């Protein structure tokens, strides 16, 4: 923040970006389990940096002609060892390559009956399997050759895993995680904005991360490149 004020603001840039320092991922995962004081301390650190930046704009007489936008890339939700689903209870992992995560990808061998695989996985609690062509359109996760043939949506707060992983990692999963269905409120990020291009004193409904690009380009008077955002999102927040 201090560098933005010192080095960039005098040159009147069109756009300045600042990535806030945060907790190392391992500490954040551990802290999120009970929203420990470390998380509060990280928030206070970011808040103090924003306060210095706003004070710097005010001192320089620039507060009312600079748009300030604060965003986060995603939310977090607690996960724990007692909320796990063993994928290997329904699937022979020797016949399937697995991309593990909050959205699981399955690359079955040619000999695997894909429909039967989807049925077996979906029979497990807290998992929903489907062909990539059947992934809900709102997730934009169907039309690329790097997307696995079978996509498994994991219920937020749960972890798809295997017996061998649990044996090798007796303390995991724990803390918090992200990457679940973005319709889940805990996955929502943050969007705060003030400045000459933004409406004042209003609270709008949820925005999607893919909408931020269109909002910023319109505020800057630029024509956006093709993107997955909703152009109407800018109407909700801009003057």
Per-region residue spans from a language model:
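Active-site neighborhoods of enzymes that stabilize oxyanions during catalysis
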Residues: 98-219
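Histidine-centered active-site/metal-ligand motif
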Residues: 26-30, 74, 173-178
